Curated annotation (Swiss-Prot):
Substrate binds at R269, R305, Y309, E335, Y363. PANTHER family: DIAMINOPIMELATE DECARBOXYLASE (PTHR43727), GROUP IV DECARBOXYLASE (PTHR43727:SF2). It catalyses: meso-2,6-diaminopimelate + H(+) = L-lysine + CO2. Specifically catalyzes the decarboxylation of meso-diaminopimelate (meso-DAP) to L-lysine. PROSITE patterns: ODR_DC_2_1, ODR_DC_2_2. Its cofactor is pyridoxal 5'-phosphate. Belongs to the Orn/Lys/Arg decarboxylase class-II family. LysA subfamily. The keyword Lyase applies. Pfam families: Orn_Arg_deC_N (PF02784), Orn_DAP_Arg_deC (PF00278). Its EC number is 4.1.1.20. This is Diaminopimelate decarboxylase.
Amino acid sequence: MKGIFPIDKFRTLQTPFYYYDTKVLRDTLSAINQEVAKYPSYSVHYAVKANANPKVLTIIRESGMGADCVSGGEIRAAVRAGFPANKIVFAGVGKADWEINLGLEYGIFCFNVESIPELEVINELAAAQNKIANVAFRINPDVGAHTHANITTGLAENKFGISMQDMDRVIDVALEMKNVKFIGLHFHIGSQILDMGDFIALCNRVNELQDKLEARRILVEHINVGGGLGIDYGHPNRQSVPDFKSYFATYAGQLKLRPYQTLHFELGRAVVGQCGSLISKVLYVKQGTKKKFAILDAGMTDLIRPALYQAYHKMENITSEEPVEAYDVVGPICESSDVFGKAIDLNKVKRGDLIALRSAGAYGEIMASGYNCRELPKGYTSDELV
């Protein structure tokens, strides 16, 4: 089954472009809010890194979510979209001074700190502004996630976070500082996780750390477990909204949250992944020695995930109902890795057909580049194309 698209409207637009189905997005946000409402101590922050399209951000902000940012630019994008500063968390292993100052000036909720040197800089910059910065420590729990190696973030070998062995020392340093307030612990073990067992392993590790801190009579107000929930790239129509019920219930059942604590989540891909498609036009159909190539006007500069992660995106010829044939679907970029998929079954392709690369709402438009001096793809919502 193919997706439903306003093809007549698409014909009037310059390809390639991103298309966001706002019904899918709003249904996803509604499903999240429905589940979170069961747990009054839960808060969700949208991971802006997944998609910072202003129209998409506005719809997410209207749902009541906070924002999870990893750069000063993302903080600005969130504020422009109307996210309250007191719902913004700022993570990232390499925060520049101007970015920290920006967060302080806006009065964001929390800095997720990844090292003692960073903590010292935040304390110094906060003192210069005569402010106290809320900080949580990103702990690397050494928990492996069943996902692509490039998007694991919770292993000891990864660059992210403070090791469990160093946690006590970092907390001791923070408690001596005058311009930071230690309010919580932060974790994030990876992305595109579909095995709830990975989240259970994280819960077990958080429980261990909580017990360790309580033995020192240190009470933590906030626990932030990051995000990581994946989507079904193979069947975007069958499961357009992820299983948020199981996701939040896993934490409710496994993480021993104290009565005074709040639990924070940072969801990105699961929020926007299924609402977006990259729409591209077929430039040529080329007969090779052993295969056919469908050459698109979209390439790895527009959607880098297949080249970077060997990621799969379901592809559909949305302008043909001819019999199915197999094609290697490639782009125009001068790189051998500019391949969206090999031996892909598509309704017979001809020049001018429109190909939809599905499940491209996350880490698609936001990761586009100008390599080969190409223009960045535009993004349109279904609200605009009625």
